[in-house]
From Swiss-Prot:
It is found in: Host cell junction, Host plasmodesma. One of its GO terms (biological process) is transport of virus in host, cell to cell. It comes from the Viruses. Keywords: Host cell junction, Transport, Viral movement protein. This is Movement protein. One of its GO terms (cellular component) is host cell plasmodesma. Belongs to the cucumovirus movement protein family.
Length: 283
């Protein structure tokens, strides 16, 4: 999920007469690539022991600088009413575990403002997820628009902060977090109704029950079992039949078909071998 919009909506959002430059900044292949590589937009971020705290700004530094310069130049020229604001209606995070449910650990995920040195959760937009609760969906909704300014050496914007706690003995990846959002930029700003951070626990996917038809593995196993049963049945049955046959059945060998009414046919009907009291006789 990348930035979306048209030149018309960008013009309305920025109150600018021309938006070609802003559109290029936001939607160029380079800008979209930076959103993915620097901000993990729509990508899976692995939480490891050597990366126990992750801070992901929602706008890359280079893109932030170019957008801020665009609004500042318009503001200085008297064409725009401000130096620009960043608006994010919602941030959605999909969280899944990559270890057993027995692992003792948790994740603390929250929305922060890089203008705050302490990186405290803004508006209580913070959620704690225990390992055994996963998978889950988390949503954040900030109540204000963030000014596109530089504070000290930090480019001010919203950021997703993820903290890993516990997981003693697990040095590798214990959880995967995939975040999506859509940032908007305008020369106007507003305040919004406070909505608590959302946490929705999701039932794990039952991949066996969801199959409408037998899976390839199930079909293979069934076919293999059928083959084994069939071969065992044929061999066993043949052996049992051979042992169970009477002496008369063993001697009753089929002869080629003979025309009805012929002398051979009459002889065939007359002389039939039988066993009577252990003695072979012809009748």
């Amino acid at each position: 999920m990348a930035f979306q919009g048209t030149s018309r909506t960008l013009t309305q959002q920025s109150s600018a007469a021309t938006s070609d430059e802003l559109q290029k900044i936001l939607f160029s292949p380079e800008a979209i690539k930076k959103m993915a590589t620097e901000c993990d937009l729509g990508r899976h971020h692995w939480m490891r022991a050597d990366n126990a705290i992750s801070v992901r700004p929602l706008v890359p530094e280079v893109t932030h600088g170019r957008i801020a310069s665009f609004f500042k130049s318009g503001y200085d020229a008297g064409e725009l009413s401000s130096k620009g604001y960043m608006s994010v209606p919602q941030v959605l995070c999909a969280v899944t575990r990559t270890v057993s449910t027995d692992a003792e650990g948790s994740l603390r995920i929250y929305l922060a403002d890089l203008g705050d040195k302490e990186l405290s959760p803004i508006d209580g937009q913070c959620v704690t997820l225990h390992n055994h609760d996963l998978p889950a969906l988390v949503s954040f909704q900030p109540t204000y628009d963030c000014p596109m300014e530089t504070v000290g050496n930090r480019k001010r914007c919203f950021a997703v902060v993820i903290e890993r706690h516990g997981y003693i003995g697990y040095t590798g990846t214990t959880a995967s977090v995939c975040s999506n959002w859509q940032a908007r930029f305008s020369s106007k700003n507003n305040n919004y109704t406070h909505i608590a951070a959302g946490k929705t626990l999701v039932l794990p996917f039952n991949r066996l029950a969801e199959q409408t038809k037998p899976s390839a593995v199930a079909r293979l196993l069934k076919s293999q079992l059928n083959n084994i049963e069939s071969s065992q049945y044929v061999l066993t049955n043949a052996k049992i039949n051979q042992n169970a046959r009477s002496e008369s059945e063993e001697l009753n060998v089929e002869s080629p078909p003979i025309a009805i009414g012929s002398s051979s046919a009459s002889r065939s009907e007359t002389f039939r071998p039988q066993v009577v009291n252990g003695t072979l006789v012809f009748s």
